Amino acid sequence: PANGFSWADGKGDAVQGNNNESTSEAANAYGAMVLYGLAVGKSEIVDKGMYMHASTTAAFWQYWNNIDGYKNLGADYNNFPAGYTKLTTSIVWASGADFATWFSPAYAHILGIQGLPSNPLILYVGQYADYMKDYVELGMTETLTGKPSELKANEWMDLWWNLWAMTDADAALADYNSVGRNYGAEAGESKAHTYHWLHTFKALGHFKTGTGELTANDPAAVAFDKGDVRTYVVYNFSGQTKTVTYSDGKTVSAAPYGFTIQQ
């Protein structure tokens, strides 16, 4: 697609044209192509999935979040129309955008829908930690304390802990611990996964790859920064040791069929 993203509803039967709501759902589909291609050794599937995932995530930052406008790069880089005051949008149409969802007016849903299903295929959502801080603050507008623990039932408390962990894992984990296991998990999430996600980000810090500042020559390689400590994480789908090189000069010798983690 010309704009870098797919249409969730492409029939063209609405006055506003086609639309797309949850970019993360599309990113999961295209990221799954990458993982499948790596697992079965089909590079053409990997390449196609990488293109579609990268295009979708770039479109997410430009059209849903106006990241260049957020960074104040100038009027020529601003993708939101004059007078639009929200940090983000949720539904992009062929003719515009809505700060809404199809099913709910709650801010927790309007912003949270860009972060599900929650797994490593949506790590791009947290690649700008400063933006994510403001994103979480807006998403929690309708709570008393600005924390996910105050969300109503079915407002995705666990997904919001996961999103918050991308910018402040300590705060997210503290709020999670104030609730314990006494909450209802989002339909596509599990309590075990939320626990793992929060503790992983507490240990690793902020997602560092994704913006182009730090890259790797393998699609299953990422990195995280916590203070002065950088952690490199590689998953090797093959049966042979693989050497992965990062753009900062770090090389990782990844063991077969599993994770290799180095600092």
Question: Regions from the language model: what does each represent?
Answer:
Residues P1-K11, V34-V40, Y51-Q263:
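Ser/Thr/Asn(+Pro)-rich, low-complexity disordered segments
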Residues A8-N20:
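Active-site-adjacent structural elements in folded domains
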Residues E21-N28:
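Aromatic- and histidine-enriched alpha-helix N-cap/loop-to-helix transition segments
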Residues S43-G49:
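Surface-exposed patches in mature extracellular/periplasmic domains of secreted proteins
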